[in-house]
């Protein structure tokens, strides 16, 4: 008798890999799949880095506070003008390391929130209809990342120059002190530019959250109508 070969279960097809992006009638640009796509790279990074960056910022602020006390004590005890100038530059540099770390932590936290919307929204659509639409990364989200990077680079450059100027102060010569004061005034603009870029990126991140919430509210209604129309 011929032996019967047991039927092998056929491999289930999946389209978790997104199809080409397409624009919906309501102007949202999405990719379609039958499963949630999970987090993208910036959202994964946000999950991992928001807490370490926040801790780094708090530590930098604490160090700047201690350096501020040291500098005020140097002024009170009539320490050398060169030492006071050096401490001024170092304290400012450490403080702005704290600023860039905390503002970056906020940006990473926004990316983490967007990741929750993306992953959980995909899971809900998978369970409800099996037809998932995932937003492509909006221009505002890309701008948020770019603004954070530019702000961080501006502040890091300013901090590096503060340290360089502090190391260049020699004794209490008038030339060294004048150069240190001039650099302090010039770097203030660079620091403010960096903080401004950070804040602009955070605004873009909040605008992205609003954009995602608008899409998800519309998509929830669509899924509910699909469920109601199905037999």
Identify the function of each model-found stretch.
Residues 63-80, 157-176:
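Membrane-helix interface motif
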Residues 165-211:
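Alpha-helical transmembrane segments and their immediate juxtamembrane interface regions
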Residues 4, 129-161, 222-231:
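Hydrophobic alpha-helical transmembrane segments of integral membrane proteins
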Residues 40-58, 136-153:
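Alpha-helical transmembrane segments and their helix-start/interface "positive-inside/aromatic belt" motifs
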Residues 35-39, 123-140, 176-186:
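Short membrane-interface loop/juxtamembrane segments of multi-pass integral membrane proteins
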Residues 2-35, 120-128:
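Short, charged cytosolic
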Residues 43-46, 80-96, 177-194:
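Membrane-interface segments at the starts/ends of alpha-helical transmembrane spans
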Residues 107-128, 202-231:
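Cytosolic juxtamembrane helix at the C-terminal end of the final transmembrane segment
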């Amino acid at each position: 008798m011929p032996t019967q070969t047991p039927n092998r279960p056929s491999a289930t097809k999946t389209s978790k890999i997104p199809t080409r992006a397409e624009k919906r009638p309501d102007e949202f640009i999405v990719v379609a799949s039958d499963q949630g796509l999970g987090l993208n790279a910036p959202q994964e990074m946000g999950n991992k880095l928001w807490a370490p960056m926040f801790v780094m910022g708090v530590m930098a602020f604490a160090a700047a506070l201690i350096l501020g006390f040291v500098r005020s004590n140097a002024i009170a005890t009539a320490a050398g003008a060169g030492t006071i100038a050096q401490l001024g530059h170092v304290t400012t540099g450490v403080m702005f390391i704290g600023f860039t770390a905390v503002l970056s932590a906020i940006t990473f936290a926004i990316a983490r929130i967007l990741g929750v919307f993306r992953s959980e929204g995909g899971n809900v659509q998978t369970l409800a209809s099996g037809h998932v639409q995932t937003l492509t990364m909006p221009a505002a989200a890309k701008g948020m990342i770019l603004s954070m990077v530019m702000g961080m680079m501006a502040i890091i450059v300013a901090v590096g120059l503060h340290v360089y100027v502090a190391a260049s102060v020699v004794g209490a010569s008038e030339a060294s002190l004048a150069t240190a004061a001039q650099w302090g005034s010039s770097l203030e603009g660079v620091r403010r530019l960096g903080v401004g870029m950070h804040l602009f990126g955070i605004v873009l991140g909040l605008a992205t959250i609003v954009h995602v919430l608008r899409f998800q509210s519309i998509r929830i209604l669509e899924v509910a109508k699909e469920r109601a129309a199905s037999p």
